[in-house]
Design a protein with these regions (language model features):
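Predominantly soluble domains enriched in secretory-pathway, periplasmic, or organellar proteins
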Residues: 22-400
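N-terminal non-cleavable signal-anchor helices
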Residues: 4, 20-21
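Bacterial N-terminal signal peptides that target proteins for export
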Residues: 2-11
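Bacterial N-terminal signal peptides
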Residues: 11-20
Length: 400
């Protein structure tokens, strides 16, 4: 039994020890990650870790390889960023310490990835060799290798490039095979991957998206007009073709850059999407996928991104009109602002509740932050050749 006279000193000592044990180390600030994000700096193979509350760069992480078409996903706790390099490198970056905790060279050429619903697995889409590899999200140890095989017209077994890889509810992954014209659905609930193939979906699927509720997977087709839709609530129904006129059409217009399907916007019962090769944003009915309207815009749109409250849509454009961002009011369908953030605008990202929009201008070496209410610039960050911008709220959103 502790004597009464010793209780207060011992309690004070215990409290001091507890506080000391909880203090942040000099290299790791004790803080949350909900307002953090990263900017890909493609020329230097680095990430800029940013604070969206203070609108500043906190740290830079180097040694990430070829980031010319890099994408980023986040761990379930939003502390770690998984960086998918074009050179096949997969890196796990600690946003708080600014360190690479793990890195593997898992293929010769990769094009993105996804994190499973339970956060335990990281999947990587590979061009070379074509397929999907799965890794433990804490150690980056390989868990499974799923070759993207198909039979060509001569009956020979080939491997296809994998595109449009996303996570789906039920601890599943969905992706498309470019050369094969297939969609594959992988269930990871058992000891081994369970693969379902959907064939003859259309020619050369080049990108895909999954809706915010995880029900519909939509693949864009490079080799023909139209889109391929898979209802993940009823996969047994197979793939449905929608928007048959979506594409380059009979008049094969020059396309400076194929629009990203991730840049589509689902706002209420409407889908807002970039036209291919035309200076238009298209509006489709999200129930029957009929085309409702065409809005003329500044150039060939790449990303058509909604503010989280769905009141605004922000649009950037392909070369040579890629120094402009236009803002559209979704109610009036009018362009309410034409912004000039800098040369070669590549990406846009909203803060979680939409009060800010961050825009990367690669050839101007800067990221510009806008107030989405006033549409005024509120900050400018120096960044060498910035491209993709990714905020940690993506950790808790399907397909992002």
């Amino acid at each position: 039994m502790i004597a009464p006279a010793l209780r207060k000193p011992l309690a004070a000592l215990s409290l001091a020890a507890l506080v000391a044990g909880c203090q942040a180390t000099p290299t790791t600030e004790l803080r949350g990650t909900g307002d953090l994000g990263v900017v890909v700096e493609r020329a230097t193979g680095s990430l800029a870790v940013v604070d969206t509350s203070e609108r500043r760069i906190l740290d830079r992480v180097e040694g990430l390889g070829d980031l010319s078409h890099a994408s980023v996903k986040f761990s379930r706790d939003a502390r770690y960023a998984f960086v998918f390099g074009r050179d096949g490198g997969l890196s796990r970056v600690d946003l708080l310490s600014g360190e690479i905790t793990h890195r593997v060279m898992q293929s010769g050429n990769s094009i993105g990835g996804a994190v499973s619903q339970d956060g335990a697995l990281v999947a990587v889409a590979n061009y070379e060799p074509g397929g999907v590899k799965l890794f433990d999200s804490e150690t980056l140890e390989e868990v499974a290798d799923i070759p993207a095989t198909y039979r060509d017209a001569a009956g020979e077994t080939r491997r296809s490039k994998v595109v449009g890889l996303v996570d789906a509810p039920g601890n599943r992954f969905v992706y498309s095979l470019f050369e094969a014209g297939e969609i594959h659905l992988v269930d990871m609930n058992g000891d081994t991957p369970e693969l379902t193939r959907f064939t003859d979906i259309g020619e050369e699927p080049y990108d895909a998206l999954i809706g915010p509720n995880g029900r519909y997977y939509i693949a864009g087709l490079f080799g023909e007009d139209g889109l391929a839709l898979l209802d993940l609530w009823h996969p047994e129904a197979g793939v449905q073709r929608i928007l048959p006129d979506y594409g380059r059409g009979e008049e094969r217009l020059p396309v400076y850059k194929m629009p990203h399907l991730e840049g589509w916007t689902l706002a209420g019962d409407e889908a807002w999407l970039p036209a291919v090769g035309r200076h238009e944003v298209l509006i489709a009915d999200a129930d029957d996928w009929s085309l409702k309207d065409r809005l003329p815009v500044h150039g060939q749109p790449i990303f058509v991104m909604r503010r989280p409250d769905e009141r605004q849509v922000w649009v950037n454009f392909a070369h040579p009109d890629n120094d402009v961002v236009q803002v559209i009011d979704t109610e009036s369908r009018e362009i309410v602002a034409t912004l000039e953030p800098g040369e070669a605008v590549l990406h846009m990202e909203f803060t979680p509740k939409g009060e800010q929009a961050w825009v990367s201008a690669r050839d101007s070496d800067r990221v510009v932050v806008y107030d989405t209410r006033t549409l005024e610039e509120v900050a400018r960050l120096d960044s060498e050749s910035p491209s993709g911008i990714f905020f940690t709220d993506r950790a808790h959103r399907i397909g992002l």
